């Protein structure tokens, strides 16, 4: 369980808004960095997820992940290669969830593939965008739980846009104060997010 406390000189201090702290150092105008929406228990959290894609110096490309399941990353990279045609088989791929947090929720799938595509193409992701969605093997974007809470957290922290699965859109289409962008598949999501 993610503890919402910070260690200060006076001891442990309750952290009232973990999302704010965890995304406060996100670099602007750098490829491979995206804000994702996850849920810990029933509490929504926004986190920064980073990907670095670089040509390999060895015969076999390296795949490394910190904070996310390695097998899930391997699956998502295969989907990117097969469904999008991203030629990453000869590229080292490093994935990191900033803050040392471990996430075991499929809603971060879309963030992983967007960050990888961003790094590979060297196209930064707008800093006012959040992404959430499970990615299926055919490249479809599947619905996530607690979509209303995720969007409320994005609004609270001043984000202007959130990319969500189309199957979640009906429940939140009337929400004001944030642009909600529904997507059906991976190609559509990448094109929307990477064009700004």
Report residues per predicted region.
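Peripheral, non-AAA+ core regions of ATP-driven protein-machinery
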Residues: 3-39, 43-196
């Amino acid at each position: 369980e993610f503890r919402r406390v910070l260690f200060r000189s006076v001891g442990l201090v309750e952290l009232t808004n973990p999302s704010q702290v965890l995304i406060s150092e996100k670099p602007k105008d750098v490829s491979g960095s995206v804000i994702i929406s996850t849920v810990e228990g029933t509490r929504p959290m926004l986190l920064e997820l980073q990907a670095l894609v670089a040509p390999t110096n060895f015969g076999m490309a390296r795949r490394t992940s910190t904070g996310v399941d390695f097998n899930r990353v391997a699956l998502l990279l295969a989907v990117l290669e097969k469904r999008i045609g991203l030629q990453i088989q000869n590229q080292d791929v490093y994935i990191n969830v900033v803050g040392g947090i471990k996430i075991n929720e499929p809603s971060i799938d879309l963030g992983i593939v967007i960050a990888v595509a961003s790094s590979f193409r060297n196209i930064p992701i707008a800093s006012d965008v959040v992404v959430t969605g499970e990615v299926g093997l055919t490249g479809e974007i599947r619905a996530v739980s607690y979509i209303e809470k995720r969007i409320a957290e994005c609004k609270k922290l001043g984000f202007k846009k959130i990319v969500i699965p189309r199957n979640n859109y009906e429940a939140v289409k009337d929400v004001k104060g944030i642009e909600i962008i529904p997507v059906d598949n991976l190609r559509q999501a990448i094109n929307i997010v990477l064009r700004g």
